[in-house]
C-alpha cells in the first residue's frame, strides 16, 4: 500500500500527462473535444482511472461519445507509455477511461431546480388572492352556546 498523498500526487500527474498527450501528441480527430476531468489511482498504484468529458463542436451539436471512447481505447497503449516515461514509477499503472457524467448530472439538477422555481412562482401567484376558509377562530365557543345539560353536571368544563 502506498501513501494516500503519494497516490493523489501520482493521479494528478497522470491526469496532466494524459491531457497534454491527448491535446498535443495524439492526432486522432475524435479526441479534439475530449477533456480530462479527474484521475484516480488505486492504493497499490497499479491501476489508474481517467475520467473524461466530450463536448460537441458547437453548443447545439451532440457529442460523439462512442467515437471518443473508441479513440481513447485505441490510444491507451501510447498514453500508458507516455505516463510511464513522465512519472518514473517502477510499475506504470494500467489506464481505464470512464466517461464523466458529472456535467450531465449538474445540467439535470439545474433543470429540476428551474421547474421547482416555476412551480413555486405559480403557487405564490395563486396564493396572492387567496382567503382563509371559515371563521378567524373556528374553535372559539361563545357562552350562550354552552349546553344547559352541564349546569348540574360535575363534568362541566371550567
Swiss-Prot record:
Residues 127-158 are annotated as: Disordered. It is found in: Cytoplasm. GO terms for molecular function: ribosomal small subunit binding. Keywords: Cytoplasm, Ribosome biogenesis. Residues 134-143 have a biased composition (Basic and acidic residues). It holds the Pfam family RBFA. One of its GO terms (biological process) is maturation of SSU-rRNA. The keyword Cytoplasm applies. GO terms for cellular component: cytosol. One of several proteins that assist in the late maturation steps of the functional core of the 30S ribosomal subunit. Associates with free 30S ribosomal subunits (but not with 30S subunits that are part of 70S ribosomes or polysomes). Required for efficient processing of 16S rRNA. May interact with the 5'-terminal helix region of 16S rRNA. Belongs to the RbfA family. Monomer. Binds 30S ribosomal subunits, but not 50S ribosomal subunits or 70S ribosomes. This is Ribosome-binding factor A. It comes from Mycobacteroides abscessus (strain ATCC 19977 / DSM 44196 / CCUG 20993 / CIP 104536 / JCM 13569 / NCTC 13031 / TMC 1543 / L948) (Mycobacterium abscessus).
Amino acid at each position: 500500500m502506498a501513501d494516500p498523498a503519494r497516490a493523489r500526487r501520482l493521479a494528478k500527474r497522470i491526469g496532466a500527462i494524459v491531457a497534454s498527450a491527448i491535446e498535443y501528441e495524439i492526432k486522432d480527430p475524435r479526441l479534439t473535444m475530449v477533456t480530462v476531468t479527474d484521475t484516480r489511482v488505486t492504493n497499490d498504484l497499479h491501476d489508474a482511472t481517467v475520467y473524461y468529458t466530450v463536448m460537441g463542436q458547437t453548443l447545439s451539436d451532440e457529442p460523439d461519445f462512442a467515437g471518443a471512447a473508441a479513440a481513447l481505447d485505441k490510444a491507451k497503449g501510447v498514453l500508458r507509455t507516455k505516463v510511464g516515461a513522465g512519472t518514473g514509477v517502477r510499475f506504470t499503472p494500467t489506464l481505464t477511461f470512464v466517461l464523466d457524467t458529472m456535467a450531465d448530472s449538474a445540467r439535470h439538477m439545474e433543470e429540476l431546480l428551474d421547474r421547482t422555481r416555476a412551480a413555486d412562482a405559480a403557487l405564490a401567484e395563486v396564493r396572492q388572492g387567496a382567503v382563509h376558509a371559515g371563521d378567524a377562530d373556528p374553535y372559539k365557543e361563545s357562552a350562550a352556546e354552552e349546553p344547559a345539560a352541564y349546569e348540574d353536571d360535575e363534568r362541566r368544563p371550567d
